[in-house]
Amino acid sequence: GIEAVEILKKESVDLLIMDIMMPRMDGIRATLKIREKHNIPIIILSAKSEDADKILGLNIGADDYITKPFNPLELVARVKSHLRRYMQLGSTAIKESEAIYTVGGLAINDDLKEVTVDGEQVKLTPIEYNILLLLVKHQGKVFSIDQIYENIWNENAVGVDNTVAVHIRHIREKIEINPKEPRYLKV
């Protein structure tokens, strides 16, 4: 954990695979610390397989959670998927003429990858950011859970309702005054 935080201070990293159970600084604390300054994809790879552990990992900013034992080919596929999405959205080669999107008091500066609500900066994970950007770019269009998943993860949606719902809930908690009566994100 501590080593990951230190490496990120000195080097450019495109993706992190983080274990939860580490000495001195566990993966939860390390992920929280990393999220303060970095928006890179984080995959938690852990022996902790309870639903509560997975939900905690996603709640604190991880973009994915894989339990041990795991299929190495699945891990490679997930890494490629996260990197593809991160690079596509982070690429300076693909720029639109207007990189700032607004809906009421919500503003997304896609050049800086920043989200503000009524002038206050909001920290989102890369997946949360990508979901919000997709929905704001296509205001008024209705997306199904499967369509959101397929647009963000670039893979077929099979039994992913809860994954997308958890991310939507987290976005609402961060951008809405009252998440139960959303102004911006209505699903």
Regions found by a protein language model. Name each.
Residues 22:
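Receiver (REC) domain active-site loop signature in two-component systems and cognate sites
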Residues 1-15:
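Acidic, metal-coordinating helix/loop segments flanking the phosphotransfer/catalytic sites
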Residues 114-186:
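Positively charged, aromatic-enriched patches within helix-turn-helix-type DNA-binding elements
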Residues 3, 26-29, 53:
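Acidic catalytic/metal-coordinating carboxylates
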Residues 12-14, 37-42, 158:
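His-Asp phosphorelay/catalytic-motif detector in bacterial-type signaling
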Residues 4, 57-58, 148:
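Residue preferences within the helical output face of two-component receiver
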Residues 18-19, 45:
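Active-site T/S-Asp motif of two-component receiver
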Residues 32, 36, 41-102:
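Basic, amphipathic DNA-recognition helix from helix-turn-helix-like DNA-binding domains
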